[in-house]
Curated annotation (Swiss-Prot):
Main function: Seems to promote the survival of visceral and proprioceptive sensory neurons.
Primary location class: secreted
Pfam families: NGF, NTF3_N
Protein name: Neurotrophin-3
Length: 165
């Protein structure tokens, strides 16, 4: 999954939930995890057997640690869901060439030199403002689980196959 900005409007949470429901109904997350090939830490391919998944259980149950499930997504399904395009997420078969910009102003299309800019005084003081955490801009490629915006544990997909391959 590649993060990028697109010129389409922002998504509401309901439309994204609807898209996820459509993916689920299309058979991506059924009660069984199909046979998959997964790469182990030493680079060898192994075949993962079918495993029964309990409702609400993590989809990679039965998969060795360090490997992630591979989910096949029909390209036609994604074409039908164009209205669910997110300004922050783009599904792509290619790895990103560079990390996403931290701020919208770093986008080349947004940088318009003729636009008016607000002037700031030199030596601007920041009284009472303290950094809560360090900002880090980098691609994370080794995560297998994460916490969503509602605080629920979710599985991060390592690969999404598109098309009939």
């Amino acid at each position: 999954i590649q993060s990028t900005s697109m010129d389409q409007g922002s998504l509401s949470e309901d439309s994204m939930n609807s898209f996820i429901r459509t993916l689920i109904q299309a058979g991506i997350w059924k009660n069984k995890v199909p046979k998959q090939t997964a790469r182990t830490k030493d680079g060898m391919q192994t075949t993962v057997k079918e495993a029964e998944a309990e409702p609400g259980a993590v989809a990679n149950k039965g998969v060795r640690l360090g490997s992630q499930p591979v989910v096949s997504v029909d390209t036609e399904l994604l074409r039908q869901q164009r209205r669910f395009s997110s300004p922050r997420v783009l599904l792509s078969e290619n790895a990103p060439l560079e990390p996403p910009p931290l701020y919208l102003m770093e986008e080349p299309m947004v940088l318009n030199q003729t636009s008016r800019r607000k002037r700031f005084a030199e030596g601007k003081s920041h009284r009472g403002e303290y950094s809560v955490c360090d900002s880090e801009s980098r691609w994370v490629t080794d995560k297998s689980s994460a916490v969503d915006i509602r605080g629920h544990q979710v599985t991060v997909l390592g690969e999404i196959r598109m098309g009939s391959s």
